[in-house]
């Protein structure tokens, strides 16, 4: 499957859980300059001036059946508000909008006014009036105004009402480059990078000071070793039968109550592009976006064991979103010992999904091989939030933390009870390669002299492991460090990747500009010039350039280059893109077919691109014509595309390249008309083909009559230096004679032309074919009309000289081709 790199929405309320200090006010600029591109930065809610109030009492307004006058304590004063909600309750805390408040749901700024003769000092708000969609609200939340559930009286009167709703925060949308999808597709991954940036900023004034000003919260980023203490051993058996599963953790939770998640959790998921489902599934999705660790929960009523194995050949599964798939032994499944209950790392199955009646679950946290997950997703043409993270690589060291955090939330938000210790089965740990980094090399690459201690501190802030313990002072610039990137960083493999991280922390925008030191001024090579000028020539001739994929289908390959060794992609994106092309004509036929299906005719396209063979790549030029080549308003007749027009364009190209091509009649190309195709020869080597499309090809690809030509642009051709020979202006006139004759169709004009030139090598300067006439009664002969140009630089040709030449030409043509003069 092919797609653009994903974006990641960072939610302030989740991000600040991982910082012990308030977040920087210029977080957007810091992110854009030091981490990755910021695509958007905006407040989660546009609502303003909303506070928490408490209903003291309410009474009906005289003359109205629904309206009540409500006395509300806003913490600083008591206000009277007219409200028509049916769910008013004394003592309940509510959302109060006063004069000047802006409500996103109704897109209005409030003003105090009289209603039924009673002055109203604001408005009590429903969630819908705050712009929250009712689709994911409970029936109770949709009924009237919103009533805070605050049994412990933790929400202060007069405080910002958006805070307990989880709406008082910003959204930072990251545009992720492919190499950073793995570690920045989570709040914790971004928090760790942001911590490194903030720490490096605080140490810029004192390079020798260690950067320890910004730390992530221990309570959020470390496991509690006592959380599962004093629990009995689990009866659940876990067995891993495949190396693609490095680690599998499972925990049984009982007494689960399936219900909607708290509003703050639903809002967080919605802002991340994930629809809330129920509290259990929502908790696993929260862990997904916060820690980057995919989890899965099974309804475990009938599950006694977990077995991770390869899928069986032709094994059928139905996913929880009711998609049916047929698997093979290259896929990985989670089973209950007998049947599959999940497609590993991608999606759960319908039978074991969480239902409204579920009371007992098994929570799964595992590490699966990125290659295995990616191959299965490509084959099945499916992708999920979980598979995206697994195939890009997750941080295996975070699995225990994410697993424990999910268990805590299941106890808190789903009334779950952990009755047994989790089952932890680990086969192996993923490691990053050790990289040797020379500090002098860092300076040369970045172009800025960095203090060795500063380099070390920056690497430590980024969670690199440095395996050298030597003191890094100002004089040790040539010291070599052996280090490893953190497990979340799958993109750091060589020393240049490490230098890229150091450059980010320094700030690419702060790198001083330097003049490039090169011995000579750069210029285009002769080959590059010829390619560029060739493009201009074809555009000036009325062609449109196309740029097509290098990958084609096996069907298209067989049509143009059958029975040849080819290069096939191991994991093609689709069946239409699986073989590297050996001819540009296959791509041009697809372009013509696309145009003709949309009733676009009279087209002329060309492409200059690479073709691929087992041992080499070749640059080629191909062009295609169909319909009218020239649509003229000034001439009486349009110029239609034909074999001769195509040949004329090719002659223009060969003249531009300074080469002489010869034509060899052939019938070896099945996609061309058998009577109208020729190989192109240069120095007696076949370097191309020209011809008219075969009627069967036209039918198959919905083409009108078209003409194609392809020419291999070898280095010899492109590196040919065009030479120009200047001649004086002729002093003597040119003599022109026409010659028409009947000749067998088996003889080509090229053969006849060569014979004529050999007969009069000096005075004949040009031979043109200006008419061809097919005899109606026979297909064996046709009439050719030639125009011959005679000229001599040294003298004026006499009539008898020209007649003598014409006699020699005629006799030679009769001798070799048995012509009949007309």
From Swiss-Prot:
Molecular function per GO: ATP binding; magnesium ion binding; phenylalanine-tRNA ligase activity; tRNA binding
Task: Kindly indicate whether the keyword Transferase belongs to this entry.
Answer: no
> What SUPFAM superfamilies is this protein classified in?
Anticodon-binding domain of PheRS, Class II aaRS and biotin synthetases, Nucleic acid-binding proteins, PheT/TilS domain, Putative DNA-binding domain
One Gene Ontology term from the biological process aspect of the record: phenylalanyl-tRNA aminoacylation
Q: Where's it found, cell-wise?
A: Cytoplasm
- Free-text cofactor note: Binds 2 magnesium ions per tetramer.
Keyword terms = Aminoacyl-tRNA synthetase, ATP-binding, Cytoplasm, Ligase, Magnesium, Metal-binding, Nucleotide-binding, Protein biosynthesis, RNA-binding, tRNA-binding
**What GO terms fall under cellular component here?**
phenylalanine-tRNA ligase complex
Q: Major location, coarse class?
A: cytoplasm
Give the EC number. Answer: 6.1.1.20
Instruction: Give the residues the record marks as binding Mg(2+).
Output: 491, 497, 501
Q: Which residues form the FDX-ACB domain?
A: 730-822
What reaction does this catalyse? tRNA(Phe) + L-phenylalanine + ATP = L-phenylalanyl-tRNA(Phe) + AMP + diphosphate + H(+)
Residue ranges of the region described as Disordered: 201-224
UniProt domain B5: residue ranges: 430-513
Q: Which family does it belong to?
A: Belongs to the phenylalanyl-tRNA synthetase beta subunit family. Type 1 subfamily.
Question: What quaternary arrangement does the UniProt entry report?
Answer: Tetramer of two alpha and two beta subunits.
Under PANTHER family, the record lists: PHENYLALANINE--TRNA LIGASE BETA SUBUNIT (PTHR10947:SF0), PHENYLALANYL-TRNA SYNTHETASE BETA CHAIN AND LEUCINE-RICH REPEAT-CONTAINING PROTEIN 47 (PTHR10947)
Report what the protein is called: Phenylalanine--tRNA ligase beta subunit
The species this protein belongs to is Onion yellows phytoplasma (strain OY-M)
Q: Which gene encodes it?
A: pheT
